[in-house]
């Protein structure tokens, strides 16, 4: 198998493979699950070649039999400055051996990303995806599980809302970062956003698994009790997709349930289904939403490969000089 950069002449074949995979996925997944995958950069997304992406193809006997694509994060970041990349797509033609082609593509992408100065490669994969072994065999490890919950008609349980709830204002970002660090296992936050600056660059995007709001009809609130202990963002749908709820909350007493009810109140009178993307460590919010008509739509695995280990520079000691 020969791996090389994708060129314009490869696009027709790449699009053919992508359409074929699209048809198979559409038959296997509920429509809402497929829509979520398309919106959240789950493995199977594809960007035009002209955008800031790396794309490589696998060739056998002169024919393209697979391709892999990755982008900088946030999406569209100049690749010359990107230290974190996300794998958007990996596909192998049906007639080819995916156990040979897929790992070769993953390995080549890893090598090229490292040469460009990237520190980490991330990928979001549906549970039990047949391509999962290709990543595990090339050094990717799972660091989190993402759970997407969905309700055709969500039902609030109470009109009791959290004490201290108020609209987000300028200056809240640093306190929101502290909330993120408190509610996120250290092993995850150190990978995704070890500094406030990195968190700001990624906050609100698909990188953390929380669907980004794309419309203008969105509302954002925090629960302020000297420190911020909860956050909710509600976006009413402006098209075919469901309404979106995003949450961060400390697992304290009635707070998750009250925050869930408050989030649903922001969508009152909406006839549209709703969904929310949460992590395995957000079990308190998942349970709160389950009690309000939500069910698990799909589970996805978040994997990472460390391309380069950052080692702190040893400080030089000052040695007294005599004489």
Predicted feature locations:
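A conserved beta-turn-beta hairpin within the catalytic core of GNAT-like acetyltransferases
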Residues: 73-87, 236-246, 297-298
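Conserved GNAT acetyl-CoA-binding A-motif
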Residues: 113-126, 269-280
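A short, internal acetyl-CoA/4′-phosphopantetheine-binding micro-motif in the GNAT/acyltransferase core
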Residues: 87-100, 244-256
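Active-site/acyl-donor-binding loops of N-acyltransferases
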Residues: 138-158, 271-323
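Conserved acetyl-CoA-binding loop-helix of GNAT-fold acetyltransferases
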Residues: 97-111, 137, 253-267
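Conserved beta-strand in the GNAT
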Residues: 55-57, 63-72, 86, 222, ...
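A short beta-loop-alpha structural element at the N-terminal edge
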Residues: 2-25, 163-191
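Active-site rim helix/loop that mediates acceptor-substrate recognition in acyltransferases
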Residues: 27-55, 60, 191-218
